[in-house]
C-alpha cells in the first residue's frame, strides 16, 4: 500500500531553517544512546532515567562503548599504555612486513610509531650491529631495507642450510660466462662459450627436471652466435646477448624468444646495459657505443673512452659508467654528452652493481670497492677484502643483500654493511663467472659447464 506523501517527503522541507526547537545536546544524546542500548538490563526493574548532566568536558573517545560488567568499572591498562620503547621491543619479535603493513591498520598510535624512520633505523642497526648503509643518504628507505635485511638473514641462516640447491649441468658443453634472471626469477638465460644462449624455466625445478631447459635461442642450426656469448642484459621482456662475434642480438621473450634485431659491430662485445631509450655496449676495441633500441637499433654515438678493453658497464638516466682493463672508471654525462669523471684505480674492475647512490664493484685482485654518487660526482669511499683470493667475477647488491662470485671457485653471501659481513660461503669444483639474484632465486654461472641454483624461502 502506498502511503500518502508526508512532510518528510517534501523536498523543500529540508531547506527550512525556521525550526523554533533548540538544537539538541549531542553529548547528552551520546550518553543516552550508550545507556539505552549498551548498558546491561536489570531483571524486574525498569532502568531509571539518568538525570540531565551538564555539558561534559570529556572527549567523545571516553564515551566509546565498554563491555558489560557486574561490578564497578575498573580501568585496565591496554597495550597502547606501554612506553614506545616497550612497544618497539615487542615489534622486534614480529616479522618486519607484518609490522609495516598490518600494524598501521590497527590504530593511529601504532601507525605513527611504525611510520617513524627512526624506528626502522634502530631496528635495522640492531639486526646487523655494524655501520649501515655504507653510503649515507638522506632519503634512505629504512623500512624496505629492514625487510630485505631480515629476509636475507633468515634465508641464509645456519650457513644456508635452508636453501634448496640445484645443479643444471645438461644444457651447455662449454664454460658458462653470463647469467640473467627474468620475470622475478621464474626464467633464466645463460650465455656460454659453446656460442649458445639457453632459456631455462626455473619453475620446473624439483617438479619436472626434463622441462627445466626450454630451448636454445636462435634459428641457426648449430648455435645462437658465431662466437662465445659473453654478456646478457634485459629490459622487461626484451633481452640482448653480446658475443665475441662482434654482434648483439635482441630477443623477445614475450614472443617465445624470437629474434627481433641484430647489431653488427667491429669488436667483441664484453658488456651490455639495456635502458628504455638506449642500449650501450662495451667492446674489446676500448669503445663505449650507444644505440637507440627503439629504431633499428640505430647507432647514436661511439666513443673510445679507454685505452684498453671495456670490461664492465652500466647506465642510468643520467650517466654511463664504464670500467676498463686500463685501471680507470669513466663516468659519462648523458645530458652534457661529455666525460664527467675519469677515476684512476689501482686495479681494474670486472663487474659492477648499482643502486643509487651506491656503486659496488669487484676487481681483479679479489677486492670490493664502493663508490658514492654525491650530486652527480662519484667518489671511492670504501674498499673491502671479503675473503676472495682471486678475481671477483660477479656481484649483486641490493638494500639488504650482497652476493659475490670469484675465480677462486666460491660464491659468498654477505650483509652489505661496513665492512660486509659474510654469512655463507659455497665452494665449487670450478671457477664461477657471474651471479644473478632475483626474487627467491640465486644463480651462478660456472666454468664447469653448469648453472648453480639456490632456491630460497619465499
Curated annotation (Swiss-Prot):
Positions where N-acetylmethionine occurs in the chain: 1
Region Disordered, residue ranges: 1-28
Compositional bias ranges of the Acidic residues kind: 16-28
Pfam families: F-box-like, WD40
Top-rank taxon, per record: Eukaryota
Keywords, comma-separated and alphabetical: Acetylation, Phosphoprotein, Repeat, Ubl conjugation pathway, WD repeat
SUPFAM superfamilies: F-box domain (SSF81383), WD40 repeat-like (SSF50978)
Segments annotated as WD repeats: 171-210, 224-261, 264-301, 305-342, 344-381, 387-424, 427-458
Domain called F-box: residue spans: 76-123
Chain positions found as Phosphoserine: 18, 59
Function (record text): Substrate-recognition component of the SCF (SKP1-CUL1-F-box protein)-type E3 ubiquitin ligase complex.
Subunit structure comment from the entry: Interacts with SKP1 and CUL1.
Name of the protein: F-box/WD repeat-containing protein 9
Source species of the chain: Bos taurus (Bovine)
Gene: FBXW9
Amino acid at each position: 500500500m502506498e502511503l500518502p506523501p508526508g512532510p518528510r517527503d517534501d523536498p523543500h522541507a529540508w531547506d527550512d531553517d525556521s525550526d523554533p526547537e533548540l538544537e539538541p545536546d549531542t553529548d547528552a544524546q551520546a550518553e543516552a544512546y550508550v545507556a539505552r542500548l549498551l548498558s546491561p538490563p536489570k531483571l524486574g526493574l525498569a532502568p531509571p532515567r539518568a538525570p540531565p548532566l551538564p555539558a561534559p568536558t570529556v572527549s567523545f573517545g571516553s564515551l566509546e562503548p565498554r563491555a558489560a560488567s557486574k561490578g564497578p568499572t575498573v580501568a585496565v591498562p591496554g597495550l597502547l599504555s606501554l612506553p614506545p620503547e616497550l612497544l618497539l621491543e615487542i615489534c622486534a619479535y614480529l616479522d618486519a612486513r607484518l609490522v609495516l603493513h598490518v600494524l598501521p591498520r590497527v590504530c593511529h598510535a601504532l601507525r605513527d610509531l611504525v611510520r617513524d624512520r627512526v624506528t626502522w633505523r634502530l631496528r635495522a642497526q640492531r639486526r646487523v650491529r655494524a655501520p649501515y648503509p655504507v653510503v649515507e643518504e638522506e632519503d634512505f628507505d629504512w623500512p624496505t631495507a629492514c625487510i630485505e635485511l631480515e629476509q636475507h638473514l633468515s634465508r641464509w641462516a645456519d650457513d644456508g642450510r635452508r636453501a634448496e640447491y640445484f645443479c643444471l649441468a645438461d644444457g651447455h658443453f662449454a664454460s658458462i660466462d653470463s647469467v640473467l634472471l627474468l620475470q622475478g626469477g621464474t626464467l633464466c638465460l645463460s650465455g656460454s662459450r659453446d656460442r649458445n644462449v639457453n632459456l631455462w624455466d626455473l619453475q620446473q625445478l624439483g617438479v619436472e627436471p626434463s622441462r627445466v631447459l626450454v630451448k636454445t635461442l636462435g634459428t641457426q642450426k648449430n648455435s645462437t652466435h658465431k662466437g662465445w656469448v659473453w654478456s646478457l642484459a634485459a629490459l622487461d621482456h626484451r633481452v640482448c646477448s653480446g658475443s665475441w662475434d662482434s654482434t648483439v642480438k635482441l630477443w623477445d621473450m614475450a614472443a617465445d624468444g624470437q629474434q627481433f634485431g641484430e647489431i653488427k659491430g667491429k669488436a667483441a662485445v664484453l658488456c651490455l646495459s639495456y635502458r628504455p631509450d638506449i642500449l650501450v655496449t662495451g667492446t674489446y676495441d676500448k669503445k663505449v657505443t650507444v644505440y637507440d633500441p627503439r629504431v633499428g637499433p640505430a647507432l647514436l654515438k661511439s666513443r673510445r673512452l679507454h685505452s684498453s678493453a671495456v670490461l664492465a658497464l652500466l647506465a642510468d638516466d643520467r650517466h654511463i659508467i664504464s670500467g676498463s682493463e686500463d685501471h680507470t672508471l669513466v663516468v659519462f654525462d648523458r645530458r652534457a654528452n661529455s666525460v664527467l669523471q675519469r677515476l684512476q684505480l689501482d686495479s681494474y674492475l670486472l663487474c659492477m652493481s648499482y643502486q643509487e647512490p651506491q656503486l659496488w664493484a669487484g676487481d681483479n685482485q679479489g677486492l670490493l670497492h664502493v663508490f658514492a654518487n654525491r650530486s652527480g660526482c662519484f667518489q671511492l669511499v670504501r674498499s673491502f677484502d671479503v675473503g676472495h683470493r682471486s678475481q671477483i667475477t660477479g656481484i649483486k647488491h641490493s638494500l639488504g643483500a650482497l652476493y659475490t662470485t670469484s675465480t677462486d671457485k666460491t660464491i659468498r653471501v654477505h650483509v652489505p654493511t661496513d665492512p660486509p659481513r659474510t654469512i655463507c660461503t659455497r665452494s665449487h669444483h670450478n671457477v664461477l663467472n657471474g651471479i644473478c639474484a632475483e626474487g627467491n632465486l640465486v644463480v651462478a654461472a660456472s666454468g664447469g659447464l653448469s648453472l648453480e641454483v639456490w632456491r630460497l624461502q619465499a
